[in-house]
Amino acid sequence: GHGKSSGKFTNGNITKWSNETSILIKKYVKKNNFTIIGSSMGAWIALKQFQKFKSQINSFLGIGSAPEFLENLMWKKFTKKIKNEIIKKGIYNLKHGNYEYPITYQLIKDGKKNKVLNKKITSKINVTLIHGMKDEVVPVSYSRKILKIFPNANKKLIVIKRGDHS
């Protein structure tokens, strides 16, 4: 994505990044309670952690949260031509602004296996979501969808009027 971490983005997927995050939590947080924070796709990875660390997570902060964006904001909106290219070549370089993002077919397929918006998280925790009203990448409605999966949480959505996705 946007970061400067080592490794090739094209070798990763939601399952891999979620598992790596879980390993880090086990190693460094151990059995302590913690707040989990995620931005954009990182919020999706953070939400996946509730499956393993639900009793330890005492709050969640999401910024421009983008769970399930691969299917809903990409695959469903791609033209047949783009879909065929991804299936045939295994990759499509998605141009957005000054960036080009290599979207692999394995990433799209893996995203479908990692749904988080269809399962309630019943923890009584603080959930704060921050989203830019001018976010053209991920609509504010995604943050509202996340709030719905936390029926027992103390929830807050902060919408930044001039905020975008970056």
Annotated model-derived regions:
Residues G3-Y28:
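Catalytic nucleophile-loop/oxyanion-hole region of alpha/beta-hydrolase
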Residues K30-S40:
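Alpha/beta-hydrolase fold nucleophile elbow
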Residues S55-I103:
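Hydrolase active-site cap/lid region
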Residues E100-K120:
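Active-site nucleophile elbow and catalytic-triad environment of alpha/beta-hydrolase enzymes
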Residues T122-S123, L129-H131, D135:
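Short beta-strand/loop motif that positions the catalytic acidic residue
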Residues K134-V138, S166:
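Acidic catalytic loop of the alpha/beta-hydrolase fold
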Residues P139-K148:
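Short alpha-helix in the alpha/beta-hydrolase fold that links the catalytic acid
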Residues F150-H165:
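Catalytic histidine neighborhood in serine/cysteine hydrolases
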